């Protein structure tokens, strides 16, 4: 038997499945070319529940140069540092992800998770 929260999540997923998708017209061919050029590419799905829309932004993993720039700028202003990350990793997608503050902020939160996708272990020899 599902609890109330699980039921609400299922209902929300059903509603969101009907949202129109805005992805900037990115095709499978374009995504494949990005993968060949940049290696790993991620899609960030942003659901704007107030507008009833789903926006997709495509990003590459940050390079060492990008991470260095983000680190340097973030010392003065964390939001500007996140903007550096966004601009340097953005490949394409819904133009609103670049221009609407709420959508962009949501995408930035997801980009922060890119740093947590690899895990390390240190072993004494």
What are these language model-derived features?
Residues 46-125:
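Short, surface-exposed, charged amphipathic helix/loop patches that serve as local interaction elements
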Residues 1-62:
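Short, charged/polar N-terminal "headpieces" of proteins
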């Amino acid at each position: 038997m599902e609890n109330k929260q699980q039921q609400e999540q299922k209902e929300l997923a059903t509603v969101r499945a009907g949202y129109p998708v805005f992805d900037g017209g990115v095709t499978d061919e374009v995504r494949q070319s990005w993968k060949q050029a940049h290696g790993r590419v991620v899609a960030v799905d942003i659901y704007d529940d107030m507008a009833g829309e789903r926006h997709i932004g495509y990003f590459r993993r940050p390079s060492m140069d990008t991470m260095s720039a983000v680190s340097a700028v973030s010392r003065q202003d964390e939001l500007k540092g996140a903007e550096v990350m966004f601009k340097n990793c953005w490949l394409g997608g819904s133009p609103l992800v670049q221009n609407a503050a709420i959508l962009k902020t949501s995408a930035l939160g997801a980009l922060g998770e890119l740093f947590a996708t690899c895990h390390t272990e240190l072993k004494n020899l």
